[in-house]
């Protein structure tokens, strides 16, 4: 087995999440706001992970008490990430943009690392601590430089400041939900060590939550009905990217620590910025400070990979 298999899947997940966030922003701007990307991505996650499990996954173990404990914890993880985290995520990038949402959501490793220490007994190794320092130095650099140019940027902002503030709050809630989901997924695999089945269970649980809430929410009814309609190109790209990212993240958690996956996930911010600026052209091009931050963040990922190699 490849020594850094978990880290490689974590990098793939970060790229997929970054591309999905930028695609969602592009769809929001081209098609007048929010679409059905949240529920569509849940359906795609269930189909993708379930199909892979049937083709290459292990056989279903005997349905004893341990298996049901694992299933229950996977359900909680699905609600945290696929329902709460993803709803907050999609709406925040529509209100605040891919770059700012990605910046605020860098709190995910903080939530994940603290919870992993308490619930999983993980410890910060020297390599993890160095990687953590490099990545957060990168984030701090970008935050400081962004504050310096905030007034000029806000004067020309297309979105109202109230919407941007709402997007920032939702990004914070998304970070807390995703941080908790990392830990619950890893915890569930102590009883049911099958990442593909875990991704499928989480997606099905999330879909059930939407279906149960639909009679009480016109918005959820609209989203359920929208799944039956043909999605826009960018809705499909965004949902598929996020679904692939979530499945890859499950696999990463099977082979490495929560802390490592969370730290590597931080590079999503930098990947999203470069994709938004140079590939899909939905945001302004990052400046030299962002380039330096990107190098620091990648250095942190390299430190983690070398420590595991």
Give a label for each model feature.
Residues 105, 116-152, 281-303:
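Loop-to-transmembrane alpha-helix entry segments
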Residues 32-34, 97, 120, 124, ...:
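A helix-boundary/kink motif common to multi-pass secondary transporters
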Residues 41-42, 105, 128-132, 175, ...:
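Residue-level recognition of transmembrane alpha-helices
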